[in-house]
Amino acid sequence: GLGDVYKRQLQQEASRRLSFQARRTMKTAQELYEGVEINDMGQTGLITYMRTDSLRISDEARAAAYDFIRKKYGDKYIPDTPKKYKTKGNAQDAHEAIRPTHPEVTPDMVKASGVTSDQYKLYKLIWERFIASQMSNCLMDTVSVDISANGCNFKATGYSVKFDGFTVLYEEAKDDEGEKKNVLPPIKSGDSIKVRNLEGNQHFTQPPARYTEATLVKAFEETGIGRPSTYVPTITTIINRNYVERDGKQLKPTSLGEVTNQLMSEHFDKIVDVKFTANMEKSLDEV
């Protein structure tokens, strides 16, 4: 969900939506955090600290988000109870989630101040996701449609939107086109439907896709490897040492990487075990 607006999701969403590599995302986030020149405000830090895996936001920030939502979209887009997102157990919660420091400063205002293209794009992403995370849910009905034509039966399944909620502002990007929701238009029993075209598809079971920077960062978090502050340096290091190379957006092991992995697995199996790193992080937290 939208609650993970923050931490590794920043790197993932910037990769999916903006085609930013993780290093570029964190460099730009650092600039937004340290401050840029904004019209009538001077040098202004636009986002909170970005090396955090917290999902917590302050009551003041939530109130500022509600103020904007109410003026722009109306009361029905404000949820009945405030949305509070839980941070995972191994997360460091010293800072708030990554959010705009001044929610009233819209992306258009930032753009008009002459910031760089990267700064504008990343701020827009953070700002829209933060505002959307505090909006009402999108309500959808699951729909199954049976269609009969010339004695042949066809079936379509998908969703119809009852209330757009936060999606009026923001929809989460997906790595895979197939993940996107199949939204069907409003139809009722007995309606006639025009056939635009017929397409025959044959599907084969696909092997798992190679990691992109975004999906690798997600895997780091899900398995408990590292912290948001170490994700980018880790990826950069394995590329710089020629263990991994980029193939478009995907990351693939080099022959050196494969040999290194084989030797490490044979002789240092505990160290390359994913659980070893996660448990080490947990043990360090408990000290």
Where are these regions (language model features)?
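Core catalytic DNA strand-manipulation module of type IA topoisomerases
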Residues: 1-287
